[in-house]
Amino acid sequence: MATAKGIAIGIDLGTTYSCVGVFQHGKVEIIANDQGNRTTPSYVAFTDTERLIGDAAKNQVAMNPQNTVFDAKRLIGRKFNDPVVQADMKLWPFQVINEGGKPKVLVSYKGENKAFYPEEISSMVLTKLKETAEAFLGHPVTNAVITVPAYFNDSQRQATKDAGVIAGLNVLRIINEPTAAAIAYGLDKGGQGERHVLIFDLGGGTFDVSILTIDDGIFEVKATAGDTHLGGEDFDNRLVSHFVEEFKRKHKKDISQNKRAVRRLRTACERAKRTLSSSTQANLEIDSLYEGIDFYTSITRARFEELCADLFRGTLEPVEKALRDAKMDKAKIHDIVLVGGSTRIPKVQRLLQDYFNGRDLNKSINPDEAVAYGAAVQAAILMGDKSEKVQDLLLLDVAPLSLGLETAGGVMTALIKRNSTIPTKQTQIFTTYSDNQPGVLIQVYEGERAMTKDNNLLGRFDLTGIPPAPRGVPQIEVTFDIDANGILNVTATDKSTGKVNKITITNDKGRLSKEEIERMVLDAEKYKAEDEVQREKIAAKNALESYAFNMKSVVSDEGLKGKISESDKNKILDKCNELLSWLEVNQLAEKDEFDHKRKELEQMCNPIITKLYQGGCTGPACGTGYVPGRPATGPTIEEVD
């Protein structure tokens, strides 16, 4: 399988679900995974025997909540003591530990405790999407565009890029999710003069509002706003709390401390929420939810809307903020685009429609797929796709937060203003604060507050060796250079000596070191190899089991009466039963053991079966094309535990 040159994929790495697409033959294909689903849960599970990713991981979550990791996007690029991390930890069934100020997820895998960085968990989801694309395209894929919320800061973008590297991807670019949705939308709407588009993206875990202008194939992001912690999961949480209370009232029992019960309830709540987008009532039926009690109940759409009323109403605040930032009246918006599965909720649509005085909402793009669609187009552009559809597309992104440095008195002096189009480069001259000052400390911040103490420190460095001079005389030129991925380089130069020092905002922000990333790449390969070994082991076990059952049915066949001696028949049956009993207690044996046992059985059965067939036969087992020594041909049926 040679890599096809010039093919790149677009990946929407979501908090709860992810999606992958590819642009080929003039159109975007959203690629279904091995379960036939066009979105894949961003879940990774660890068990005593294997690692599961995607649907398989989500499907077993009720049985194994402590070792099933999701929401890695809420941890990625954050510090352990970040209030967001601390608040989320209370809701997660898995354990998050502090290692050198960074969060790691602690799970039990193959009987041992293992800790993973969020980047590693995300890389496993990315690997699954990469394999999904490779299975569809029929060749390896390395180039990808990955999307992030517009609100992600520098360290979250870097960490997402690192996750791509660990998964063996060459990340061409990190782009904002709303920008990707706009590309998808822009392709659907060709040249109609300048249009102002509001993108309302309410997904499983994040909420983004963006205002763009699209003019003649050029996209410009005018403003972004949102809430990094609002989405479908929060609506699920409201339903869960509601039903926990209902269970208390009905059965006088509190299930909130039982992780498995809560997880099963959450799964049912997510299903009910989806049902309520198309029906006015949903039923929940959970057998033996807690202490043997069956929980059968229902909820109406009106009650659901009441439970989430403040959250739904709250979605309009970022809309107003984005309009203010873009200095735009709501009447100036031409199109309102819905992105993210949660925008299917009728109440959310109604609130938005009412806010825009009854305007039609644009729902022509599948809200779950729009972001991956746009990322796939952007990937094609970056790979130099020359087709007319993508040729005229130019992408202008923005910096989500102002970037600047601390000046005398702890004041934030912004060089790159929030919502500036990126890539961009800004230079400013600074000077010393006191006489004969030998050096300056350059401290780089992101944020909108007037004082640096209220903003987020990205990194710092010293510029030393400034010749003695009165205050205000030395000239220090500071340049902020932000690239298309939103990654920042800051350079300071003393004009008199030409001395230079610089920083790329990476490690000081808790980014993984190069060594750590390399180690994780190796780990990822190791886990992949282990998964392969596990698959081979199961195949060997199934081969042994089906051979034993096959032999039992062959020798017990009524049509063979008299063709096989009773002692031979019993010999085979006893051996088969002995092996099947051995299998019962040795489910976790190694592949070699299964193979060895099968060979042992074959060696015993083959002479008897050969003798039987040489003796000529007329029974139903004849003429089936059975070749001694080889398992019977025919479809391979994978067994599901």
UniProtKB/Swiss-Prot annotation:
Belongs to the heat shock protein 70 family. This is Heat shock 70 kDa protein 1-like. The keyword ATP-binding applies. Expressed in spermatids. It comes from the Eukaryota. PANTHER family: HEAT SHOCK PROTEIN 70KDA (PTHR19375). Keywords: ATP-binding, Nucleotide-binding. It comes from Homo sapiens (Human). The N-terminal nucleotide binding domain (NBD) (also known as the ATPase domain) is responsible for binding and hydrolyzing ATP. The C-terminal substrate-binding domain (SBD) (also known as peptide-binding domain) binds to the client/substrate proteins. The two domains are allosterically coupled so that, when ATP is bound to the NBD, the SBD binds relatively weakly to clients. When ADP is bound in the NBD, a conformational change enhances the affinity of the SBD for client proteins. ATP binds at residues 14-17, 73, 204-206, 270-277, 341-344. Residues 396-511 are annotated as: Substrate-binding domain (SBD). One of its GO terms (cellular component) is cell body. Molecular chaperone implicated in a wide variety of cellular processes, including protection of the proteome from stress, folding and transport of newly synthesized polypeptides, activation of proteolysis of misfolded proteins and the formation and dissociation of protein complexes. Plays a pivotal role in the protein quality control system, ensuring the correct folding of proteins, the re-folding of misfolded proteins and controlling the targeting of proteins for subsequent degradation. This is achieved through cycles of ATP binding, ATP hydrolysis and ADP release, mediated by co-chaperones. One of its GO terms (biological process) is protein refolding. Residues 3-388 are annotated as: Nucleotide-binding domain (NBD). GO terms for molecular function: ATP binding; ATP hydrolysis activity; ATP-dependent protein folding chaperone; heat shock protein binding; protein folding chaperone; ubiquitin protein ligase binding; unfolded protein binding. The lineage of its organism: Eukaryota, Metazoa, Chordata, Craniata, Vertebrata. Interacts with PRKN. Induction: Not induced by heat shock. CDD domains: ASKHA_NBD_HSP70_HSPA1. Changing residue 396 to D: No rescue of PRKN translocation deficit in knockout cells.
